[in-house]
Amino acid sequence: MANGTNASAPYYSYEYYLDYLDLIPVDEKKLKAHKHSIVIAFWVSLAAFVVLLFLILLYMSWSGSPQMRNSPKHHQTCPWSHGLNLHLCIQKCLPCHREPLATSQAQASSVEPGSRTGPDQPLRQESSSTLPLGVFQTHPTLLWELTLNGGPLVRSKPSEPPPGDRTSQLQS
């Protein structure tokens, strides 16, 4: 062999590997720190670092301060977070679409009981006069029930599909 190595012996043979290690004999009785305390300190510091990263990520995922969240301005959201912020968007838009309580009571007293001015007028009067303003913050399921049952946020329910929709024709 030209280079003096044995081709049958792998490179990671025991003798070859020990040539590159500097094994220093350590007497554990002479150590100032206990041998397990170093390992415990390592894992505790690693866990603290992971918790710190989690808290930083959690802080960064919040959409601004509470003052920013309660402001009447419209906030731009990322396109991938629309599904996640749907509940918050509905709560933000709810005060915009609701009438003041005094206005709805005044309209309810001025409108005759048998007359209807629109398909959603009685629903709007009932929901705005019987539910207080902060009820949706404490009971968010009421918002979904009102929306699904044709509450004040639903202006009109189409009885037939839009002109370009062919899904009803395909089912027939």
Swiss-Prot record:
The chain crosses the membrane at residues 38-58. One of its GO terms (molecular function) is type 4 melanocortin receptor binding. One of its GO terms (cellular component) is endoplasmic reticulum. Keywords: Cell membrane, Endoplasmic reticulum, Membrane, Transmembrane, Transmembrane helix. One of its GO terms (biological process) is protein localization to plasma membrane. It is found in: Cell membrane; Endoplasmic reticulum membrane. Pfam families: MRAP. Modulator of melanocortin receptors (MC1R, MC2R, MC3R, MC4R and MC5R). Acts by increasing ligand-sensitivity of melanocortin receptors and enhancing generation of cAMP by the receptors. Required both for MC2R trafficking to the cell surface of adrenal cells and for signaling in response to corticotropin (ACTH). May be involved in the intracellular trafficking pathways in adipocyte cells. This is Melanocortin-2 receptor accessory protein. It comes from Pan troglodytes (Chimpanzee). The lineage of its organism: Eukaryota, Metazoa, Chordata, Craniata, Vertebrata.
